Amino acid sequence: MYRNSVIRSAALAFAISLSLGAPSAFAADQATASASTTAVQRKAVAQGLYELAFSPKQNAVFVASSGGFGDAAGPSQVLRLNPDTLAVETAIPLERKAFGVVLDDANNRLYVGNTVDTSVTVVDTATNKSVGIVQLMEKKVGKDGKAAYTHDLRELVVDGANNRLYVTGHSGEGSVLFVVDTQSLKVINTIPGLGNAKAPGLALDAKAKRVYTSNLLAEVVTVGTDSGKVEQRFKVSAEQPMNIALDPAGKRLFVTDQGSEMIRKYQASSSGFESKHPGQRVLVLDRTTGKELASIPTDAGPLGILLDAQRKRLYVTNRDGGTVTAYNSDTYKQVATYAVPTHPNSLALDAKKNVLYVTVKNGDSEPKGSEESVARIAL
């Protein structure tokens, strides 16, 4: 078991930024696919870009911009982009910094995670206005006498048909799942038991009434949405399980196993820890048993993951490799690589037109305060 302080330190970077990674000597075999830029267009739009969503109903891409940090920080906002040109059509101002997003397209709602404020901002995608803030928890006074939030946020998933929003709350003292009623915009449950570590991954199977999370104790934890409690917990071979994609037609979970040297160094300082896999892969699991079905090599620093089940395609952002890699989700063979340097972060798909959208973070060499990009990949 890793010490709590180790996990908190190792996970601090992505707890704030929704992204992390460090260069690694381990890389995927690129024999089956070469890097391509011909299908990629990109546009710098704002500082501090994070997650994004495509709305078929509004025919728009919505992207969260935190504005960054420090004296050069810009405004926090959600940007509505033209899906063909990536031009900013509308800037929706927010009171709090924007990081994660999830879209309930049928109900014209975009839910935006305010990571550092442990809250969610609700945006009306039809009117392009913020319509509310859900405070998930209040600050508590610590041993130092200062008031602070005990949990921060990362991923959000929504069950629009049942009026429920699920949000992971990170803490080395015990991560939780917040449950929000999307009609009243009230927290109706806070489910403990996600592990005494950061819990970066989150996926919903509304039909099966299950939420799946991952944590940095190398676990996948299943929560029942009806029972409101942890139903299953599996130890997995992924030492740094990050984002999760769920196969809606089968029993599979796809989990990015990042292989960050930064996290590994912290893990190595923990009593009894011995690294057994370099990561840099997607782990395929049977979500009913936790059994490992496959291990798919990726480029360096895999983070975001998206499954297009209809076309049998799996897409992964490789944050340190500067690429998005595509795989056949049945054979697990790599079929394409798209160069999107410096740090591709999050993914969204226009399933009808078969177009992928990617947020791209700046690297250390870019000027401080420079705008970050959204890439459009015609698949």
Task: Set out the residue ranges of the language-model regions.
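Bacterial N-terminal signal peptides
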Residues: 11-21
